[in-house]
Amino acid sequence: MAKQYSQLFIDFTASYETYQKVTDVLGVTPQPHDSNEIPDLWFYRLERCSEDRQEDFINHFLDLLEPNFEELERLGINRKNILFWYVYEYEYQCSMSFTPSGLLRLGESGITMNIDCHDFTHRKSL
């Protein structure tokens, strides 16, 4: 079954305190980090199956970030430290859509977005 992962990455100088403060500021639970290392990356993910309604992750992530840019900057986190990463596993056809308002907001925010597409049907035959 195809899956889609909408991911928010926030890079910072390694610090348990900063990791916890980012969690508190954004008010969502990040993916667990390696507890043996001091975290330098905060990572939040939305996951869905292809049959589900497409999540408007751009607007969702910006709704989390925009009211908190000043607080994040006080933690030493600038927009260049933030990345949206969309990973799309597909079978037969890669098809995705984004709202105009989301793309406009993303462009105005100065945040980078990466998109990776993987045809998982090739992995089935391996």
Which sequence ranges carry the predicted segments?
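Acidic (Asp/Glu-rich) sequence patches and key acidic residues
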Residues: 1-126
